[in-house]
From Swiss-Prot:
Residues 82-87, 153-168, 238-313, 373-460 are cytoplasmic. The PDZ domain-binding motif is involved in the interaction with MPDZ. Residues 33-56, 113-129, 191-214, 339-349 are extracellular. Residues 289-299 have a biased composition (Basic residues). This is 5-hydroxytryptamine receptor 2C. A motif (PDZ-binding) lies at residues 458-460. Residues 276-301 are annotated as: Disordered. Its main location: membrane. The chain crosses the membrane at residues 57-81, 88-112, 130-152, 169-190, 215-237, 314-338, 350-372. InterPro entries: 5HT2C_rcpt, 5HT_rcpt, GPCR_Rhodpsn, GPCR_Rhodpsn_7TM. Disulfide bonds join C128-C208, C339-C343. Interacts with MPDZ. Interacts with ARRB2. Interacts with MPP3; this interaction stabilizes the receptor at the plasma membrane and prevents the desensitization of the HTR2C receptor-mediated calcium response.
């Protein structure tokens, strides 16, 4: 049996040796150092690099580990430093990235070490249940985070007013703490069981794997299948609510446009028949200001719904990837327990060894999903890879003082409005009317033209 210090050094030397050996660098000095260092203390159990043979799967695993750790560190940095990402959903995604990063730091390297030793556990035996517990903890935390995100978004869309009361940063942290508490509660029994009875965590007294059928069944349903069912149901309910809100908004907006057209028609008729428009009787004096408020509301509401749809699309891809990556492992794990000796146990073990690594790969895919489908994450990752860690500064806002009512010609009105806004003007420059009254109040103009211009025009 090796001690913990030698085991850690052995793992590091194996990783270095793999990289050097894989790229055909002269490895005889490295092999000699590794052999001389560990053969004396490791009882001759050091994994030997065969001459002329390259272990491409092992190198691929090393690359996956590096990408998993690096990608999730970028996600954590983006949510921490970008103010645009400071919301409940992204706090959950940052906590999920922490779990995935810990998978790359603590779980994957030990699993690679087990592969290099041909699934014979090379570390102290008491570390086996600890490693299994960490594996279950982070896997459970991943599915619980996705389940919590799905529930939180559904409640936010279904009852936005009620949800806004509980959507502060503190409340989001409390929800994340509950997710981690549930995950810890699922994984804590493993080291307790394993330290009392090593047969529960060792197969053939050599391979470190969870060997308690009851815990495998209960843990699989509690940690995977039940949260997965909740996540899928709430996700489809969210899509349904968004579609219904879109249809209701479009129908309401269409009716409003018809009402506006009717009102404009009445005003034009009154102007032709009665001369001045301001002297024409308005059938509903309150219609005009109310119409102005309604014209702005559908645009903002539709934009909010479109943003929710985009976010739901990204999260849906994350959910789908997680489902595809982890379902094979958990289904095979349950089948191996239910069928017992009727199944080919060697085949089941090989399938589980492959499927568990497919699940590990999921921890490194999420940052790629964010990069492909979210511009804010993509820009943040690009900045950090260039070693630019300065947060984006908000553009300054210029305050335009209140302008008194002034008689302007049509051409002057066009010039002044086009100078301060990109919106089209109702009257053309060659309007035959000599002048019109205009008053601008509370006009805010950001330097960045992409921002929304807020202005109020009356007495036109």
């Amino acid at each position: 049996m090796v001690n913990l210090g030698n085991a850690v050094r052995s793992l590091l030397m194996h990783l270095i040796g793999l990289l050097v050996w894989q790229f055909d660098i002269s490895i005889s000095p490295v092999a000699a150092i590794v052999t001389d260092t560990f053969n004396s203390s490791d009882g001759g159990r050091l994994f030997q690099f065969p001459d002329g043979v390259q272990n491409w799967p092992a190198l691929s695993i090393v690359v996956i580990i590096i990408m998993t750790i690096g990608g999730n560190i970028l996600v954590i940095m983006a949510v921490s430093m970008e103010k645009k990402l400071h919301n409940a959903t992204n706090y959950f995604l940052m906590s999920l990235a922490i779990a995935d990063m810990l998978v790359g730091l603590l779980v994957m390297p030990l699993s690679l070490l087990a592969i290099l030793y041909d699934y014979v556990w090379p570390l102290p035996r008491y570390l086996c249940p600890v490693w299994i517990s960490l594996d279950v903890l982070f896997s459970t935390a991943s599915i619980m985070h996705l389940c919590a995100i799905s529930l939180d978004r559904y409640v936010a869309i279904r009852n936005p007013i009620e949800h806004s009361r509980f959507n502060s940063r503190t409340k989001a942290i409390m929800k994340i703490a509950i997710v981690w508490a549930i995950s810890i509660g699922v994984s804590v029994p493993i080291p307790v069981i394993g330290l009392r009875d090593e047969s529960k965590v060792f197969v053939n007294n050599t391979t470190c794997v969870l060997n308690d059928p009851n815990f495998v069944l209960i843990g699989s349903f509690v940690a995977f299948f039940i949260p997965l069912t909740i996540m899928v149901i709430t996700y489809f309910l969210t899509i349904y609510v968004l579609r219904r809100q879109t249809l209701m908004l479009l129908r309401g907006h269409t009716e409003e446009e018809l009402a506006n057209m009717s009102l404009n028609f009445l005003n034009c008729c009154c102007k032709k028949n009665g001369g001045e428009e301001e002297n024409a009787p308005n059938p509903n004096p309150d219609q005009k200001p109310r119409r102005k408020k309604k014209e702005k509301r559908p645009r903002g509401t539709m934009q909010a719904i479109n943003n929710e749809k985009k976010a739901s699309k990204v999260l849906g891809i994350v959910f789908f990837v997680f489902l595809i990556m982890w379902c094979p492992f958990f289904i095979t794990n349950i089948l191996s327990v239910l069928c017992g000796k009727a199944c080919n146990q060697k085949l089941m073990e090989k399938l589980l060894n492959v499927f568990v690594w497919i699940g590990y790969v999921c921890s490194g895919i999420n940052p790629l999903v964010y990069t492909l489908f979210n511009k804010i994450y993509r820009r943040a990752f690009s900045k950090y890879l260039r070693c630019d860690y300065k947060p984006d500064k908000k553009p300054p806002v210029r305050q335009i003082p209140r302008v008194a009512a002034t008689a302007l010609s049509g051409r002057e009105l066009n010039v002044n409005i086009y100078r301060h806004t990109n919106e089209r003007v109702a009257r053309k420059a060659n309007d035959p009317e000599p002048g019109i009254e205009m008053q601008v109040e509370n006009l805010e103009l950001p330097v960045n033209p992409s921002n929304v211009v807020s202005e109020r025009i009356s007495s036109v």
